[in-house]
């Protein structure tokens, strides 16, 4: 009975403790606990190893297995012995493992691209839509299947999941991970679209190996023979019986009629999962089997792309609804003939959602599911009908109509639900409706079949939900039968006929990533099908209905028409860019996803004007305009309706529901109308309760708990109501789910997640979405409660009208604030219309919505930041609308009727709202072109009135006094900033036209202090002239008015005189004349008083202008003095700077003159003859300097003082720095230049020194020869003294060389610290070989004659010897007697030296005269050759030195250039040169280039120097090393070849590396020099 109960994959069943375990031995035992039902290897076994070979006596359900799981159970000792199978990490059941962020991120792309609260997941209570699940990650060890059995253990899947078409993560196959499976199975598994789960379903559980697509034969239920050892996969894609031979098929000889259930020994009491007559093979049972294995997951149903592929059957072929065109999967259900127990005996671990059944295995191993509770079962070979299932009652005829629409007229739908309906007739109907499916492959059949089968599976599997649905359906049936309405609903065949023509349109509209599924569900066709018990029950039932939606993508199909221009939409983003066109489907999805709000401006393709989305929603009576564009007026009618105006609300009840796709428009039956009325009553109660709550909150705030702002209070309270509604829904859903045992087993966090997900599916009703929605709902459902709420809002708004924006920063969002303001405005308009009191209420509305006086607007900088953001948003929107209404063209208070601004409109436009809230800054408003006209009109009215001159003056005085107060307040508050003054002037320009000129004049009085330059002066002058001209024009107009008034007065006087001449008839005439005379006298006195006032005002204004002018002149003088002082300091630095300072001072004088001229012009302006009422304002403008002006002047003074102080500090710092530099130079005497002394030029010094040296040389040679003849030891003594003097002399000259060379920067040779001075340094003429050091030494002065002779000897040797660093190690030392011959270019020197040596060896053989003659000749030849060589080297040295100095000067190096160059020349290693350059000059590109070029030039220079000093030897230095360096050796080798060829000598001693013959005067180390006595 239980030998076919094989849990887990084959390798796990074959695992045995016996050494010789065979594949046929099923090592299962209680190992069912060792794998979580279907391959979930947990790695812990609770059974003893002794019972491993026993077959299981009991079978457990999934929930039982989970309840038996023990975390503390130890590993069996035998399990680690299987190295390839054992996983050390214990993996708990996936259902007990909480979700991690990594797992959530592995969901499909649709879920990852939006936050959780925006995911409109259509999944219901039992949906299984997880995307790529947790168990699919490789890091969990072996790939475990995904939990898709119960929604509790799944992640929520969204509307945009595409887990089949877009597999987010490649997964290894089962054989890759575990090393099992044959090649055929692997090939089958990889023939799909990428890597899949071990059972071929990338987003489903391991038990769903018979799912709808991506199937392969790699799983643990591979087809096997009767013995269970497996017989391999099928050899082709055919679905015929012999190819699907296996342990379930029972097919031995290839019979095509045999079902899967003929093996009686597999499942005990039932011969198979499909226990039926094996000879029966009908289409109904076939479709039943297909739908049984269908899944509810949107991961599969939502991504079918193409039409199905027919699978070969015994007789014909069917169109399988789930097969993708690229995959031919092996269906185990093709040849099945389902019977009575088709659903009873299906084991739990092989069904999609076993937890919904609530069944289990009994002691005998039989499985008991919800099918045992089914009241009606079909017989033997007919499909079981569910007469109580309202969904299938509708779906079956619909599927038939999709396949054969013509036959729909002959069918009586089962939705009539009459009591005398015969079950047999129903079955025949169903069979006849399903019969065409077996022979057609059209898409309509596919869709109809899917909807039928999925619904049946949903009804069978979900026990808890279907119990509720049975009860609801039965209640509905009883309700319909009691009322006697039979066949009241329209026939579904007719509906389907209407749907069919739109299928192609949806095929064109649906994106490629969405499946094409057009079959509407019962929730689409008849939403009010449930009996409304209560509001909460209605919500719960609505939620249960939504459970059946995941089978279909959320394509908005309600209003399906062929795409036309009205289906294309544009919208304007916040950046004022027009986006589009987009289809209605896209716009609807974006709106549901939360990207749009009701403030978005949209239009159809055929519209000319953008309108807010909320306004279009009102046009559609609460429906979405994208999907209900047929409810919108035509473009022409919509163009005639002003923005903000909507038609009057309909008298009929409208559906106030959250924005969802509405059902297909059909005529409502009487039953549905009654249900609609019941829902409206419930909705009315809820809306009324909401309005009462808001009204109570507003009234409660009167007692002192007022938040201070009506809109803020409404927003906060409304959001509180939203939160309460959501919380109430959570409680209801929690109470409903708490009845479920599976839900009770969840942790608190998981329960909260499930409840929150279901609350998101519900959404908010319209009356809680926004305050406008509440207003609409109240106007439709309960106008009385709406008026009461409006009244409370208006009263509260009157109370806090002065604090509209007081608490803006506390509000949650700008959108809610605007919504609340709009609601307040609507409330005021509603109250206005209800009371029929237009004038007073409109003025109060204006007063309330203004939220402040004009004085508040005059302080834009004091507005809070959030308010400015609001103002900017309003202004931007008004600018984009292109129809702003200027507030300047309307009086502040609306005294006329409401139709003046509200022409039959229920709601104000945005512009009018802005006007009342006073939010638009004047820069966004159009210019006031009627300003002058209004002024002239006012004057004309004054002139036409019978008002005297003094009355007009009084009026103007009062007006000027008010303006003066405003100006004074604003100027005192904003005087510090000129820009603020300009803004204030602009703001006052809105109120009055006269204020601008005086404000501008006042600013121009201050502007010359800030303006500099002739260009600015011209601009100021032009401005002054323009303003003066405008002012004169105004004054002329005023004078014209005064003249008219004077004429009237004269006329009255003449009339009075004429009347006095007439005889007085009676006392009345006399009295009248007396009164008139008194009146004239009073007028005369007043006129005289006015003239006196006028004169006084003129005098005061002149005095004030004079004082202001004097003050300005004084300030200008102070500034001129400061400038002169500064320019004087600059002048003291240099003559050139002084000249520029003189020019600047002259220019400043000109500027001062121009500046002083401007105030004079402006001061002369008010002195013209003007109207008397103009001087009050002028006096206020020309009054004494106020506090702000004084403070401004003081600040300027302080800044000037600080500037002067800072300049003094800078001068002092510069002086201190110079002193410190001088002191530092004094300390570093070795690098400081010596005191300037009268010196000869370098050429003169060198020429003189050369002559002196030549004479001394000749004298000394002569003297030496004489002494040599006379006494030989005397010569050695002379040599010793000269050698010692050379040693010390060289050091002294080396120290003095840098000082001497620093005299002239351009001729410095850059000699090192211990080097010999260069003989070429700064020798421009090149007439001698003497170095500049000699000149420096000579100029040092103070030497006696003995010291001079010693210095001459030193100079002789040092000028012609090379430094030790430049000395070649292989050079021979020439004779000391003629060191002047040793130069670089002297190839003819050696013969001379040899001759001299021969003459010295011969002694007296040669006469002294001949030797002297020879010396002179040699000296002359040497002089000429040396001059040529020295001139060449000098040129390059000068070039090198000047280049170094120029480069360092360009780099702005902060080093002493000659010292730094000399120091760099001393460095041998190039990397040291680069290091020091980097240290002192930085790492820049210039410093690197300098180091590179310096090394190149120094190398060239040294090569020349080395060539010149090739044969020099220094007696003061030790002998060079025996082994020369490689470079020196190579150079010496080249030199040797050249010299050898030229000299024709027998042997060059330099080849040996040392000197063969030492110089005559050389003293080697360790040898003492003994001077022989006379």
UniProtKB/Swiss-Prot annotation:
Q: Which residues carry this modification: Phosphoserine?
A: 272, 291, 399, 403, 407, 1007, 1370
* InterPro entries cross-referenced by the UniProt entry: GRB10-interact_GYF, GYF, GYF-like_dom_sf
- Output the PROSITE patterns linked to this UniProt entry: GYF
Keywords associated with the record: Phosphoprotein
Phenotype seen when the gene is deleted: Larvae and adults display defects in starvation-induced, developmental and physiological autophagy, which result in the accumulation of autophagosomes, autolysosomes, and increased Atg8a expression. Adults display reduced locomotion and decreased life span, likely due to the dysregulation of autophagy which results in the accumulation of ubiquitinated proteins and dysfunctional mitochondria in neuronal and muscle tissues. TORC1 signaling is also inhibited, possibly to compensate for the loss of autophagy.
A Pfam cross-reference name: GYF
Using the UniProt annotation, give all residue ranges assigned to the region (Important for promoting translational repression).
Answer: 1-640
Effect of changing residue 65 to A: reported as: In C; impairs interaction with eIF4EHP but has no effect on translational repression or induction of mRNA decay
* Keyword Phosphoprotein on entry: yes
Where on this chain is me31B binding motif (motif)?
341-369
- Biased region (Low complexity) positions are 120-131, 180-195, 232-243
Q: What is the effect of changing residue 60 to A?
A: In C; impairs interaction with eIF4EHP but has no effect on translational repression or induction of mRNA decay
Using the record's annotation, list all stretches that form the GYF domain.
566-614
Composition bias (Basic and acidic residues) maps to 206-227, 388-403, 1067-1115, 1408-1417
Q: Which domain of life is it from?
A: Eukaryota
Where in this protein does the record put region Disordered?
100-150, 174-324, 388-443, 1036-1121, 1142-1169, 1307-1329, 1359-1430, 1507-1540
Q: Where is the signal peptide?
A: none
Which SMART domains is this protein grouped with? Answer: GYF
Q: Which GO terms describe its biological process?
A: muscle cell cellular homeostasis; neuron cellular homeostasis; regulation of autophagy
**Chain's role:** Key component of the 4EHP-GYF2 complex, a multiprotein complex that acts as a repressor of translation initiation. In the 4EHP-GYF2 complex, promotes translational repression and decay of mRNA targets by recruiting and bridging the association of the 4EHP complex with decapping effector proteins, such as me31B and Patr-1, and the deadenylation CCR4-NOT complex. Involved in regulating starvation-induced, developmental and physiological autophagy, which is critical for eliminating ubiquitinated proteins and dysfunctional organelles in order to maintain tissue homeostasis.
Which protein family is named in the record? Belongs to the GIGYF family.
What is this protein identified as? GIGYF family protein Gyf
- Native source organism of the sequence: Drosophila melanogaster (Fruit fly)
The record's gene field reads Gyf
């Amino acid at each position: 009975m239980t030998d076919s109960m094989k849990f887990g994959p084959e390798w796990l069943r074959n695992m045995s403790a016996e050494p010789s375990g065979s594949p046929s031995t099923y090592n299962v035992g209680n190992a069912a606990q060792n794998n979580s039902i279907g391959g979930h290897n947990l790695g812990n076994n609770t059974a003893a190893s002794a019972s491993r070979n026993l077959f299981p006596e009991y079978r457990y359900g999934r929930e039982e297995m989970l309840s038996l799981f023990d975390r503390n159970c130890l590993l069996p000792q035998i399990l680690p012995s299987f190295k390839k199978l054992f996983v050390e990490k214990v993996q708990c059941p996936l259902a007990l493992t909480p979700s991690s962020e990594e797992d959530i991120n592995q969901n499909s792309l649709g879920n990852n691209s939006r936050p959780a609260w925006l995911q409109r997941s259509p999944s219901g209570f039992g949906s299984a839509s997880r995307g790529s699940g947790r168990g699919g990650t490789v890091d969990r060890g072996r790939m475990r299947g995904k939990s898709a059995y119960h929604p509790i253990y799944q992640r929520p899947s969204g509307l945009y999941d595409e887990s089949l078409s877009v597999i987010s993560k490649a997964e290894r196959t089962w054989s890759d991970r575990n090393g099992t499976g044959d090649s055929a199975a692997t090939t089958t598994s990889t023939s799909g679209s990428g890597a899949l789960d071990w059972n071929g379903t990338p987003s489903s559980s391991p038990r769903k190996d018979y799912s709808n697509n991506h199937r392969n034969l790699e799983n643990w239920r591979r087809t096997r023979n009767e013995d269970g050892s497996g017989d391999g996969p099928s050899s082709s894609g055919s679905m015929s019986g012999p190819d699907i031979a296996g342990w379930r098929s029972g097919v031995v000889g290839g019979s095509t009629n045999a079902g899967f259930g003929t093996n009686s020994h597999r499942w005990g009491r039932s011969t198979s999962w499909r226990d039926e007559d094996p000879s029966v093979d009908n289409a109904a049972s076939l479709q039943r089997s297909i739908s049984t294995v269908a899944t509810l997951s949107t991961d599969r149903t939502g991504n079918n792309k193409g039409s199905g592929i027919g699978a070969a059957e015994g007789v014909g072929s069917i169109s399988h609804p789930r097969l993708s065109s690229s995959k031919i999967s092996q269906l185990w259900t093709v040849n099945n003939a389902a019977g009575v127990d088709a659903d009873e005996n299906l084991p739990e671990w092989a069904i999609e959602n076993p937890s919904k059944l609530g069944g289990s295995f009994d002691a005998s191993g039989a499985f008991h599911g919800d099918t045992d509770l089914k009241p009606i079962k079909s017989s033997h070979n007919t499909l079981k009908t569910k007469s109580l299932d309202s969904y299938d009652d509708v779906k079956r005829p619909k599927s038939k109509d999709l396949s054969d629409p013509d036959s729909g007229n002959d069918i009586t739908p089962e939705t009539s639900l009459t009591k005398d309906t015969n079950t047999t007739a129903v079955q025949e109907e169903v069979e006849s409706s399903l019969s065409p499916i077996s022979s057609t492959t059209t898409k309509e059949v596919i869709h109809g079949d899917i909807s039928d089968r999925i619904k049946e599976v949903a009804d069978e599997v979900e026990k808890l939900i279907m119990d509720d649905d049975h009860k609801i359906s039965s209640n509905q049936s009883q309700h319909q039968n009691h009322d006697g309405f039979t066949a009241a609903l329209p026939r579904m065949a007719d509906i389907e006929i209407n749907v069919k023509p739109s299928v192609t349109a949806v095929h064109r509209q649906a994106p490629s990533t969405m499946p094409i599924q057009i079959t509407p569900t019962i929730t689409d066709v008849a939403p009010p099908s449930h009996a409304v018990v209560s509001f909460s029950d209605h919500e719960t039932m609505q939620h249960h209905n939504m459970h059946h939606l995941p089978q279909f993508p959320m394509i908005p199909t309600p209003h399906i028409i062929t795409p036309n221009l009205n289906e294309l939409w544009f919208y304007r983003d916040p950046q004022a860019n027009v986006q589009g066109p987009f289809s209605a489907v896209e716009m609807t999805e974006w709106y549901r996803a939360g990207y749009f709000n009701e403030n978005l401006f949209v239009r159809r393709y055929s519209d000319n004007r953008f309108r807010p989305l909320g306004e279009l929603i009102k046009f559609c009576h609460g429906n979405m305009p994208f999907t209900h564009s047929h409810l919108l007026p035509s473009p022409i009618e919509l163009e005639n309706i002003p923005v903000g105006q909507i038609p009057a609300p309909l008298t009929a009840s409208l559906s106030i529901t959250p924005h969802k796709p509405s059902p297909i428009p059909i005529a409502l039956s009487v039953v549905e109308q009654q249900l609609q009325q019941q829902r409206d009553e419930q909705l009315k109660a809820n809306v009324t309760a909401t309005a009462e709550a808001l009204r109570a909150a507003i009234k409660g705030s009167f007692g002192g708990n007022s938040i201070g702002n009506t809109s803020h209070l409404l927003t906060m309270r409304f959001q509180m109501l939203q939160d309460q509604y959501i919380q109430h829904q959570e409680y209801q859903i929690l109470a409903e789910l708490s009845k479920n045992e599976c839900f009770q087993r969840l942790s608190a966090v998981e329960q909260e997640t499930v409840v929150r997900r279901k609350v998101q599916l519900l959404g908010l009703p319209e009356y809680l979405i926004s305050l406008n929605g509440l207003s609409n709902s109240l106007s439709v459902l309960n106008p009385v409660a709406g008026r009461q709420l409006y009244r409370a809002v208006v009263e509260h708004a009157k109370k806090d009208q002065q604090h509209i924006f007081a608490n803006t920063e506390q509000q949650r969002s700008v959108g809610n604030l605007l919504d609340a303001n709009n609601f307040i405005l609507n409330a005021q308009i509603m109250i206005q219309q209800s009371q029929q009191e237009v004038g007073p209420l409109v003025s109060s509305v204006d007063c309330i919505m203004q939220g402040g006086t004009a004085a508040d607007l005059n302080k834009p900088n004091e507005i809070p930041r959030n308010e400015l953001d609001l103002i900017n948003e309003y202004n931007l929107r008004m600018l984009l609308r292109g129809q702003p209404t200027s507030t300047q063209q309307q009086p502040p208070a609306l005294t006329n009727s409401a139709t003046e601004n509200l022409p039959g409109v229920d709601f104000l436009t945005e512009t009018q709202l802005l006007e009342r809230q006073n939010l638009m800054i004047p820069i966004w408003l159009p210019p006031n072109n009627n300003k002058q006209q209004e002024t002239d009109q006012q004057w004309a009215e004054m002139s036409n009135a019978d008002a005297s001159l003094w009355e007009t003056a009084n009026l103007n005085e009062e007006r000027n006094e008010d303006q003066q107060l405003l100006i004074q307040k604003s100027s005192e508050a904003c005087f510090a900033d000129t820009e603020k003054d300009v803004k204030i002037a602009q703001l006052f320009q809105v109120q009055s036209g006269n204020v601008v000129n005086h404000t501008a004049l006042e600013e121009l009085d201050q502007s010359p202090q800030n303006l500099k330059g002739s260009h600015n002066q011209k601009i100021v002058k032009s401005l002054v002239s323009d303003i003066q001209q405008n002012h004169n024009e105004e004054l002329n107009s005023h004078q014209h008015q005064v003249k008219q008034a004077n004429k009237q007065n004269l006329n009255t006087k003449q009339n009075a005189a004429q009347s006095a001449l007439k005889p007085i008839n009676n006392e009345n005439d006399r009295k009248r004349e007396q009164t008139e005379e008194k009146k004239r006298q009073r007028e005369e006195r007043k006129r005289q008083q006015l003239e006196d006032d006028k004169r006084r005002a003129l005098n005061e204004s002149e005095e004030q202008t004079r004082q202001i002018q004097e003050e300005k002149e004084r300030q200008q003088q102070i500034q001129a003095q400061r400038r002169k002082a500064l320019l004087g300091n600059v002048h003291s630095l240099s003559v050139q700077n002084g000249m520029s300072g003189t020019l600047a001072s002259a220019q400043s004088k000109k500027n001062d003159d121009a500046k002083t001229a401007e105030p004079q012009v402006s001061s002369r302006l008010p002195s013209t003859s003007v109207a008397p009422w103009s001087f009050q304002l002028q006096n206020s403008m020309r009054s004494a300097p106020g506090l702000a002006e004084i403070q401004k002047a003081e600040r300027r003074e302080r800044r000037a003082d600080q500037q002067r102080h800072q300049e003094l500090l800078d001068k002092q710092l510069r002086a201190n720095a110079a002193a410190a530099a001088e002191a530092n130079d004094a300390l570093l005497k070795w690098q400081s230049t010596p005191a300037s002394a009268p010196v000869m030029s370098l050429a003169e010094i060198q020429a003189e020194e050369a002559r002196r040296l030549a004479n001394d040389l000749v004298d000394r040679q002569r003297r030496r020869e004489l002494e040599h003849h006379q006494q030989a030891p005397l010569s050695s003594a002379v040599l010793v003294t000269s050698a010692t003097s050379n040693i010390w002399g060289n050091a002294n000259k080396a120290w003095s060389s840098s000082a001497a060379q620093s005299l002239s920067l351009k001729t410095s040779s850059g000699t090192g610290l211990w080097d010999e001075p260069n003989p070429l340094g700064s020798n421009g003429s090149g007439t001698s070989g003497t170095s500049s050091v000699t000149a420096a030494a000579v100029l040092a002065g103070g030497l006696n004659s003995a010291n001079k002779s010693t210095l001459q000897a030193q100079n002789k040797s040092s000028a012609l010897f090379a430094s030790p660093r430049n000395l070649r190690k292989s050079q021979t030392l020439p004779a000391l007697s003629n060191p002047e011959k040793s130069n670089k270019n002297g190839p003819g020197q050696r013969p001379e030296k040899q001759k001299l040596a021969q003459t010295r060896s011969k002694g007296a053989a040669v006469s002294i005269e001949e030797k002297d003659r020879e010396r002179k000749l040699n000296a002359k030849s040497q002089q000429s050759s040396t001059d040529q060589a020295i001139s060449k080297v000098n040129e390059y040295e000068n070039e090198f030195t000047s280049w170094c100095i120029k480069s360092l000067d360009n780099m702005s190096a902060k080093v002493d250039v000659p010292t730094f160059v000399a120091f760099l020349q001393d460095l041998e290693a190039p990397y040291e040169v680069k290091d020091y350059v980097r240290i002192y000059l930085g790492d820049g590109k210039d410093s690197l280039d300098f180091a590179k070029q310096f090394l190149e030039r120094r190398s060239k220079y040294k090569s020349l120097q080395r060539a010149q000093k090739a044969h020099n030897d220094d007696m003061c230095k030790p002998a060079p090393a025996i082994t020369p360096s490689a470079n020196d050796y190579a150079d010496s080798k080249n030199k040797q070849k050249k010299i050898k060829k030229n000299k024709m000598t027998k042997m060059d001693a330099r080849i040996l590396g040392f000197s063969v013959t030492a110089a005559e005067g050389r003293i080697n180390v360790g040898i003492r020099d003994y001077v022989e006595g006379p």
